[in-house]
Amino acid sequence: MNEENLLWGKELKQIFTALLVVGLFSGSAYAMGPTKKYEACMKQTGNVLSEIDACMSKEYKAQKKRLKKVFKPYLAKAPAEEQGLVKQSHQQWLAQRDQICNNKPIVKNEKTELQRISCLMQMTQTRADMYEARTGRISK
């Protein structure tokens, strides 16, 4: 095995460990954290990068939908005079997430795409978790 594959194996292990930790601390009694479909999908990937990417892409779409859903009660809970600021803050966060996760790699390949989608998925999930925790509402 060459050095690049060994390094990528370590990076992949770190990604999976981070996802596991997020899942453990998000509380499975709530709808917070990764979806059950995502967890099942990841178990079936056999560590094949294209399959991992497909699972993460589906989960990112699910977390984006969840973020939109949980933002509404979060916004409604804010005092009327602060709702404009809450919307602005949310838009700034979306732009920051996209800037962080969509940075242009020197070399674009399957590994960098996996890192990009993992970043988008994790940041979106974490923000949706925060909105849920602050409103006390649980998305279904």
Where are the language model's segments positioned?
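Bacterial N-terminal signal peptides
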Residues: 18-26
